[in-house]
Amino acid sequence: MGCSSSALNKAGDDNRLRSATEESESCFVQPKPRALGRESTLCGKVQKESLPPLDKLKISAVSTANGVQSLPEQPLAKEAADPPGATEETQPLQGLKGSEPPQPGGKDGAPGAEGKEEDVEAVTEAPPLKGSAETEPLGAEAENQPLITAGERDSTGAVEGTEDPQAAGEMTPLGTAERVPLEAAREPGSQEAGGKGEQSQLPETVPKETESPEILEGSQPVETAEPPQLQETVGENEQSQPLETVPKENASLEVSDGSQSVGAEGKKQLQETLGENEQSQLRETILGEHGGPEVSDGSQSVGAEEEKRLQEMLGKDEQPQLRETIPREHGGPEMSDASQSVETAVKADSLHKAPEGPGNMEKIQPERTVESMEHPAGILETGAKVEMARKIHTNEEDQHIEGETGETVETEMESEKVSEGAETKEEETGEAMDLSAATQIGMDGRVKGHSML
């Protein structure tokens, strides 16, 4: 009450403003428990006094923010829509002016209806501070709404319902609303066009990228297909080269074989010619010496048969050598007798058979020698075994004889001792002792045993 009485006693608007600011500061600073209505009245007074210039600023700001000065309908609509708030704001001022004289007298008592109205007004106007503070970040147009709805938001729900479309109408002027949607529509169109252009560019670029890999991939298969072709061609060339070389080798082999065959044939012809010459020489010599043509013919037939046999027995490689050796052996014109030619043929046969003969002889001889070496040893062993068996039989006969006389046990013990002693001696000296000697020792032992007994 002290704050309200000091504010009401002052006169003039300036004094009221100063006192209201001071009292508001004192109200905020002093944390004294007071009624909410009284404190709100002071704050409400301060806000009431400050709201009218804000309304003027609101109108000017809205007009400048919209940018449309040729539309007088909007402020008229605002004024037409503002009367509820304006009446609410002007009524408290009138109430304050009318209630200023009687308040000093009525403050001591209970507060009147005007105090209640002030409380209601303060309650209705105090929250808009928060609302305005909350809606300030929305921009210049958003700041205009809390100024309009500052005193009207909490008063009635119907007023809020009417103010929202007005605020929407004030916030979005017709010119700007038409321009902005058009521009917005144009911008999405441009964006869509840009998107289409980008999409068209992207398909163009994508096909290029996709085509270029395809082309590259296509070129790569071509390139990769070419190396296999090259490889195939190289392989064909290589195959052709081996084929060519193989025929060459085969041809050379065939040529070599042919040359060998030709050489063999030539050698055969030479041999035949040599044979004919030799045979003619032999015939001449035989005719000159013996004068019997039959013998010469027989020797020739025998020599021809032996040569055929030699050729059949010999291999291709051995034929030229033997043919060379045979003409050398037969080439001497000194060989006159058919017997000599037969002997040379027999020698040649022995030469051809010699590679097999000596090996067989060697194989046969070692076997015989081994057998001859083994058989004497076996004979000696068998002889020794027979002698041992005979001696054992004699020992058994002696034991049987002794068994009849009742002295078998001692002889058996002595024979075991003798055998063990012989074994120990063999182990020590490493020389095998004859069983005959052991038996003799056993006999001596038995004799000694008999003597001891």
From Swiss-Prot:
Presence of the UniProt keyword Phosphoprotein in the record: yes
Record bears the keyword Phosphoprotein: yes
Protein keywords: Phosphoprotein
Comp. bias (Basic and acidic residues): 11-21, 305-332, 364-374, 394-403, 414-424
Domain of life: Eukaryota
Ranges of biased composition (kind: Polar residues): 230-243, 271-283
Residue ranges with Acidic residues bias: 404-413
Residues the record lists as Phosphoserine modifications: 155
Residue numbers spanned by region Disordered: 1-38, 66-377, 394-453
Protein name: Glutamate-rich protein 5
Organism for this UniProt entry: Bos taurus (Bovine)
Gene transcribed to yield this protein: ERICH5
